[in-house]
Amino acid sequence: MASKMKTRKSAKKRYSFTVNGKVKYKKQNLRHILTKKSSKRKRNLRKSGNLSCFEVKRIKTLLPYG
């Protein structure tokens, strides 16, 4: 009986796949020390980011069942 591939739990918590196969992630720098950051910068950081196609291949190896 073949063993299953393991999912990297750290990648599972950080990335999620869309229906079209793109990878979404939450942007960094929005946890603390927010007073010196402008409202525009904080507003743009609230939006989710998309990875490029080169990085998607690497993430798919970390998340085989994603």
Curated annotation (Swiss-Prot):
The gene is rpmI. GO terms for biological process: translation. It comes from Borrelia garinii subsp. bavariensis (strain ATCC BAA-2496 / DSM 23469 / PBi) (Borreliella bavariensis). One of its GO terms (molecular function) is structural constituent of ribosome. Coiled coil: none annotated. InterPro entries: Ribosomal_bL35, Ribosomal_bL35-like, Ribosomal_bL35_CS, Ribosomal_bL35_sf. The keyword Zinc-finger does not apply. Belongs to the bacterial ribosomal protein bL35 family. Keywords: Ribonucleoprotein, Ribosomal protein. This is Large ribosomal subunit protein bL35. Transmembrane segments: none annotated. It holds the Pfam family Ribosomal_L35p. GO terms for cellular component: cytosolic large ribosomal subunit.
